């Protein structure tokens, strides 16, 4: 039986936020993805307005779980059947306000639907990341001696950014300037690294290639060469997915949008222990998962 908010085992309620400068303790963070919040009518298994209540429940758990930060992996909002910029920004403001009720640092990863009828600049102006990550689409931060890298694959194959629906969602791409930045970030090999991205990087697996970053075959070798990548956390594919290659776990989280309340939701508390083993404590549709560090 899957954990629900009422049945979850929570840690001490205070404090809800732990500063990231302590050693020899686990790093703990909350994670959600693919909320697709809007007020449009349900479509298939997607209940767009209900993600507000789903997120409220997730944030309630996060605020009682002694977390270092919370991150969402993209597609935070959606749009109406007829795209309207102002209406879409209203949806973004509403869901961002709820996201920011977490009592600690929050971070965003951009997804393709975040630019369906607005620009990246619009998204950045209506959301906030913690600290130096604010107003950036790709960035890194360090928490308890672990480096976290956020990537932005929301670009067309010619390198131009996704902008107000000017894109084919099956052709995500990480442009050269970001690849060079990533190479610089990975030069230092003194810390374990975790990657966050919306579209999938495990193009080598059995997953549909339309869900993957088009130049993933260029990015993955950079990660493998570093030798310290613990895992890649991904969204985009609402059904979830998992693969493993060359000591790197690729975990795709199930989308929060899927399924009707009160029986459906998807969020997790992730813990990375001092030995760099990862435990995903999933709620509702999100299963528990251990991503253990394999040393050779």
Outline where the language-model segments fall.
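Solvent-exposed loop/turn segments at secondary-structure junctions
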Residues: 35-38, 76-79, 112-117, 154-157, ...
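N-terminal export signals
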Residues: 1-19
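Short acidic, glycine/proline-rich loop/turn micro-motifs
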Residues: 40-44, 82, 160-165, 205-207
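Extended active-site neighborhood of metal-dependent phosphoesterases/phosphodiesterases
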Residues: 82-188, 218-229, 243-282, 294-295
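Short acidic, glycine-rich surface-loop motifs adjacent to enzyme active sites
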Residues: 187-204
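N-terminal active-site segment of His-dependent metallophosphoesterases
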Residues: 20-86
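Alpha/beta-hydrolase fold active-site loops
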Residues: 27, 68, 138, 146, ...
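Active-site neighborhood of phospho(di)ester-bond hydrolases with catalytic His/Asp-centered motifs
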Residues: 31-33, 70-74, 106-112, 194-197, ...
């Amino acid at each position: 039986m899957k954990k629900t908010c009422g049945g979850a085992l929570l840690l001490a309620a205070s404090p809800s936020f732990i500063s990231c400068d302590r050693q020899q303790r686990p790093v703990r963070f909350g994670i959600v993805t693919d909320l697709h919040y809007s007020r449009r009518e349900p479509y298939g298994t997607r209940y767009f307005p209900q993600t507000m209540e789903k997120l409220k429940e997730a944030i309630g758990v996060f605020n009682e779980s002694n977390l270092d930060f919370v991150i969402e992996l993209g597609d935070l909002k959606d749009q109406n059947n007829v795209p309207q910029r102002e209406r879409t920004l209203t949806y973004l403001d509403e869901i961002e306000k709820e996201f920011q009720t977490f009592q600690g640092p929050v971070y965003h990863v951009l997804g393709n639907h975040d630019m369906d009828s607005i620009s990246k600049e619009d998204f950045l102006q209506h959301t906030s990341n913690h600290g130096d990550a604010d107003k950036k689409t790709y960035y890194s931060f360090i928490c308890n001696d672990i480096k976290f890298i956020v990537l932005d694959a929301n670009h067309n194959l010619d390198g131009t950014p996704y902008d107000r629906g000017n894109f084919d969602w099956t052709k995500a791409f990480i442009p050269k300037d970001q690849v060079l930045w990533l190479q610089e970030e990975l030069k230092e090999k003194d810390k374990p690294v975790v990657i966050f991205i919306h579209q999938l990087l495990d193009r080598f697996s059995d997953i549909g290639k339309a869900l993957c970053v088009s130049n993933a075959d260029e990015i993955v070798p950079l990660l493998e060469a570093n030798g310290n990548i613990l895992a890649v956390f991904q969204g985009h594919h609402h059904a979830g997915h998992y693969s493993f290659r060359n000591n790197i776990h690729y975990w795709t989280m199930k989308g929060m949008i899927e399924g009707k309340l009160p029986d459906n939701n998807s969020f997790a508390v992730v813990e990375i222990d001092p030995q760099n083993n990862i435990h995903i404590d999933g709620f509702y549709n999100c299963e528990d998962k251990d991503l253990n560090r394999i040393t050779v």
